Amino acid sequence: MRRLPGLWAQGVAMQKIVVQTDLTAARLPQLHEPRNAGIALDLDWVGRVQANTSAIERRAATLPGRRSVKKDWQAAWLCRAIAVMDLTTLSGDDTAGRVQRLCAKARQPVAPWMLERLGMTGLTVGAVCVYHDMVAPAVAALAGSGIPVAAVSTGFPAGLSPLHLRLAEIGASVAAGAREIDIVISRRHVLTGNWQALYDEMAAMRAACGDAHVKAILATGELGTLRNVARASLVCMMAGADFIKTSTGKEAVNATLPVTLTMIRAIRDYHDATGFRVGYKPAGGIAKAKDALVYLALIKDELGTRWLQPDLLRFGASSLLGDIERQLEHHLTGAYSAGYRHAMA
């Protein structure tokens, strides 16, 4: 049986990848780290935040060509991408049957013979992400697996319903069994610089989540500038967000490397100042295995290997898993299989 090597770092150094089989402990950040308790809104800090757009874009443009992992090393990184994936279905035609099939894929994301040959038996995705109405079927389908259900909430994707309804939706999803809540912020607060309103809204949503951990979706494609992205990231972390997330996947522009660089540097600055680790979730537009490799390399470079664990990193994705499975099969057999062999649901 073939065992995969560890995470490649700085071109030559290697660090061991461990896919944890204690699934619940591997995923829920409150079991590993003190939750981000938040801090009082510091408007002086928010006002000092800058984002050098040209420098960020130059750095991001160099990333795809700077790093290259091949063979066993690439397979190890791709298995890590699966372990930190929020396998997602957010379509208007979702049904309980589709969600059940997606959950079966979450339990067994790669063909058993492939995992056996890779020495990665026990590998699952990080979570399954669905609308509120699909939480109960997902919870039932994942029973005993340790894989948490994440629910999009708070008037997703626009987030423009009354606040009391958004908070009630969070409570309903938690009561139905969701252990992670992906909320959407009011973009107008960012665009008008109303940081107090954004902070208060985020704090109320965090409180409504209770023990479920909360991912704050910034909808970065609608925030106008990278400086707004950086400031919104900081305010949401101050208000207690466990994760910050790029996008709903419904915007015209979703996750990008410049946005990712901006957000993870905000995470690093917040950790340096407070000691709290906040997770990161890029979502939307990450459909190819090669894209996931670039994101993993960037996050490792900027935040370190601790942020490559499922409790601090997630990919919001649907089609990404199929491409990763095709790449792993090619690694083992030398041939690419047809896409229909790797259907999600």
Regions found by a protein language model. Give the residues of each.
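Basic polycationic patches enriched in arginine
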Residues: 2-3
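Alpha/beta catalytic cores of nucleotide-metabolism and tRNA/nucleoside-modifying enzymes
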Residues: 15-92, 97, 237-238, 262-278, ...
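Alpha/beta enzyme core
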Residues: 75-76, 95-123, 133-276, 280, ...
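Glycan-recognition patch characteristic of GH18 chitinases/ENGases
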Residues: 124-128
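Short beta->alpha linker loops
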Residues: 130-134, 316-319
